[in-house]
Amino acid sequence: MWFRFLLAALAIFFAGRYLSDLADETADITGLSKGFIGALILGLITSLPELIGTLTAVLFRANTDLGVGNIFGSNLFNIAILAGAVLVFATRIKPGDWIHGSLFTVHMSICVAAFMVMLIHLLRGPSTGWWENLGSITILGFFTAGMWLYSREKSAASVASTKKGQRSLAVNIILIVILGSVVVAAGILLADSCDDIAKNTHMTATFVGSLFMAMATSFPELVVTIRLLEHGNIRMATGNIFGSNLFNLCIIAFVDLMYRGTIFSNVTGPQTVLLATSILMSGLFLIGATIRALRKTSIRLDNIIILVLYLCIYFWLY
């Protein structure tokens, strides 16, 4: 089971390596904002492991703890990735890049996560009827409307401004589909192996899902974020991370619509703490980004606090 876990994790890691270049080229070809490309294309593709893993765990393995833990744990790990990468590549990021449309996804992910905390408490207990899925429908509608508004932001580049040496849009789409297929297959294998790990060890499904499975499914975000920040591209990096987090929360809403009853009634206390912690970490990142946009500062206390919070929450969970 550990061999299958490592095999799936490596497949996700290497497939994710090439996604940032494809997304960057796609942004230049289409003329769409790089923050939007980061949030939509990168967010969607890098969230494929979470989607497939959670669907497999909840619907086919009947392991809600593993599936929900995977999503909430992935969101925590994603924010920790961004905080750590900002610390490492701080000198390559221009102060003026902090306030940009990419922070739109930070606000959206905070709103959806807070609404989800409310749903968890409102829907706790026995089934109360068809209307209990209205919360998930609201989340998906909010996401769709938000992405439509976000797509209105255009970059100065023209649609026809393909640089010499770039692949065509059609080739990029084909490559994204191929890499996405690899990630899907690896996500299924990953969910199966993590379910076996949880059943054959003394670790809980929530812990396995929110740590091991979450870290493995977040490898694309890890690779993409590092490669983007190596070039100081904080806009796409932020759009990628919080776009992925937003997609992840929508995965819970999507699975809820296919789940018998409501998945929110089965969310445990520790999982709710993970979700609430992601809201806190997102808020800290947003505060730090706002301060850096207003004045140049070398203080990175917000990122350090985020990383400490991440370590403390898993020490508590274990």
Positions of PLM-derived features:
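Hydrophobic alpha-helical segments, chiefly the membrane-spanning helices
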Residues: M1-Y318
